[in-house]
């Protein structure tokens, strides 16, 4: 059975040096058809699958399901893009040193996604 000091020691071991502290962002975006405001599905033309493939063309590395047939996530620069149950696209940012870096990362991601949206006819 755990003792109080076991728990305290566990948390003390997790304390990082001030110079090793990092921050990261996570945010989800609903992707909607511009003309109908309907949520995109994975398989439809210019849908979530095609969006992910566009990201692959921009240097993101795909991660596949167990059957190695369906892209379920992307990775680049310590960042990842994943899908939520409602087909929302989530950016999990890299571990960065300051808020300015997270701002740059978020703006880069949103620009890439909005550029694809211009081509495919969706909005966030």
Question: Which residues make up each language-model segment?
Answer:
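Terminal catalytic/cofactor-binding subdomain
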Residues: 1-124
